[in-house]
C-alpha cells in the first residue's frame, strides 16, 4: 500500500477532506500518524478523533521540524502549495532526507497496485482541465453505468478517492470502473498514477499562485497521463495538444482528439454542421464503416497518405440536455473516454441524451419575459467565462468579478465585445476587469453587491438575451464559496420573478 514501505510513519499536512481521508487510510493500514494543520483546531480534527485513530496532532505554522522523529512519508493535502512560504522549507527538508512527498492520488494509485496483486483490475478514467472537469466526470460516470458497469466517481468532485475505496472494500463491492476528477493540485504530487484513459479538456490560466507560473500549472495537468494511457485531447487547445504523443514513435501511446470542428483522423470526434444541424460525429476509416456516414471535407493534399475518412453521425448536438458548444465538447470527451476503455456505443449515446448537467455550471435557473437567467457561478476563471459566452452564443448581460487570483483578464475582451450588451462588475478585482474591457465598446457598470448587479442586468436585458452570472473569479472576497454566490444570485432572480407575478 505504501510502495516499498511497510506501515511507515506518516506526516499528514492539512486536515481538509483529502487530508482526513489520507489519515484514516494510513491508520487503517497500521501506520503511525503525525497530523499537522495551520489551524489549531481544524474542523475535521473531531472527526479523526471520533474515528478512533491514534495520532499526534500539531497545530500552528508548519516547520521543517515536523519531519523529525522518524517520519518516512509526507502526505500533502491538495489545498497546500509546496511553494508556499511556510511550507517550502518543510518540503525541502523532506526531500533532502529522501522522504517521499505524496498526495492522495499517489496513495490511491499505490492502493490499486496492491489490490492488483490480488487480481483486482478495474478500468480507470481520469479527467482534468481548467474548466469542464465536473461536468465531464459526472457524464463519463453516467455513461459507464449505462453500459452496465459498476462505477465509482471520486476525486476533486468529492468524495475523496480513499474514502470511496474504503467504502467499496468494506462493502465487498469494488467497482469495475473508476472515474476520477483530478485537479492540478492533486496531480502535482502523483508519481505512479497511470489510468487506462485520460483527458485534458483545456488549459487556461488558473491557480498560478499555487504553481508558481503557467508552465508548472500545465505540466501538472500533464501528469494525468501514464506511459500507456489512451490520451483524449482537445485539438482546439494548443496547450493541450502539446501532450500529443509523437506520431513517429513506435511505442507511442494511443491518442484520440475531440473538437468543435470536423475530425480528420480515424477515431477522432467532432461536430459536423449540415443543413442547419450540428451533429456529434466520429471519424472512421471508410473501409471499416459499419453505418452510413458523411464524407469528410478534409482535402487529400493535407496529408501524404490520408486515410479514406468518413464521418459517422452519433447524435444531433441539440439532443444534449446541457447547453452550449463547450458542453458539446465535454460530451465528446466523455464519450471518447468511455469508448477508449472498450464500452459499446449504443448505451453511451442513450446516456448522452439523458444527462441534465451539474448545478452552477451554465445552468438556466429561470426564463422571465423571454430573458434567460443563467447561473455559472462555478465559472471561477477567465477560460470558464469565455466558454460560457461562446457556448451560449446569445446576447448577454454579464455579471463578473471577485477574486481574480492574479489572472490576465484580456482574453475576455473578444467574447465580451461579440456577445455582451453590458457588463456588471462586482468584487475586489472589478477595477482590473474594467481595465481589460475598457476598449470593447460595451457599457460597464460597477455594483457594490451581487443583488444590485442582478437587478441592473435585468433592467437592461431584452427578450432573447441572457443575464449570465459567470464571474471569471473566485468568490471568497464576497461569499463563503461559489455555491453561496449562486444562492445569492438565485435569490435575487426569485425577487424579480415575484415582482413579475411568478415564481421559479
Curated annotation (Swiss-Prot):
Q: Which reactions fall under this protein's catalytic activity? A: UDP-N-acetyl-alpha-D-muramoyl-L-alanine + D-glutamate + ATP = UDP-N-acetyl-alpha-D-muramoyl-L-alanyl-D-glutamate + ADP + phosphate + H(+)
Superkingdom assignment: Bacteria
Q: Name one GO molecular function term.
A: UDP-N-acetylmuramoylalanine-D-glutamate ligase activity
> Part of which pathway?
Cell wall biogenesis; peptidoglycan biosynthesis
Localization terms from the record: Cytoplasm
Keywords carried by this UniProt record:
ATP-binding, Cell cycle, Cell division, Cell shape, Cell wall biogenesis/degradation, Cytoplasm, Ligase, Nucleotide-binding, Peptidoglycan synthesis
Please give the GO cellular component terms listed in this UniProt entry: cytoplasm
For this protein, the record's Pfam families field holds:
Mur_ligase_C (PF02875), Mur_ligase_M (PF08245), MurD-like_N (PF21799)
Q: What is its EC number?
A: 6.3.2.9
Biological process per Gene Ontology, one example term = cell division
Q: Name the InterPro entries for this protein.
A: Mur-like_cat_sf, Mur_ligase_C, Mur_ligase_C_dom_sf, Mur_ligase_cen, MurD
- UniProt enzyme class: ligase
Residues noted as binding ATP in the record, renumbered to the chain: 129-135
Q: Which family does it belong to?
A: Belongs to the MurCDEF family.
Described function:
Cell wall formation. Catalyzes the addition of glutamate to the nucleotide precursor UDP-N-acetylmuramoyl-L-alanine (UMA).
**NCBIfam families attached here?**
murD (TIGR01087)
What PANTHER family does the database record attribute to this sequence?
A: UDP-N-ACETYLMURAMOYLALANINE--D-GLUTAMATE LIGASE
Protein name as annotated:
UDP-N-acetylmuramoylalanine--D-glutamate ligase
What gene name is listed for this protein?
Answer: murD
